[in-house]
Amino acid sequence: MLERIGLVIEVHPADVDENVLAGEAPEAYVARIAHAKAIAVARRSDLWVLAADTTVTLDGTILGKPDTPEEAAKMLRWLSGRTHQVLTAFVLLGERDDSPVIHERLVSTDVTMIELDGAMLADYVASGEWRGKAGAYAIQGIGAALVREVHGSVTNVIGLPIAEVVAALREVRGPLPRLAAGTPA
């Protein structure tokens, strides 16, 4: 997503344990995982590191990525007609003026689903779009038809709150080069 606004990035996977700890609140969970990812990558790189983790939560329960069509249908039935939160924690690590910099932020977006009838639910699950998606839907795809309202960052729901990340980059690194689609920064 950052490449679309002209930033040049390198992706370095972080091998961290993403299991939820007993009694861990969703906000604490995404913050812990984003921080662990940032530290894991920073140990292998001298570049600025941006790490993030996103989850879907309803009534304080974390909704992960369903493994089966049945799990996807169960999640979607639970979300049907209700407002849930998409939480993303991101961490920026780097150096500025020979001093270490760490910036952590949590972004929350409220998403309200329409009431899903049986046919709509069955059709969406049959599409397979839910695979690999926390909360069992993808707002950037046909899952957009399941969403009535979004309050907050739409790009957060897609996977990364771009405006908030760019603001944080400007805060910790200073002015960024010109941002334009297709123009590397």
Locate each region found by the language model.
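N-terminal G-site helix/loop of the GST-like fold
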Residues: 1-11, 172
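A short beta-strand-loop structural module common to alpha/beta enzyme folds
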Residues: 10-18
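Anionic-ligand binding patches
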Residues: 23-185
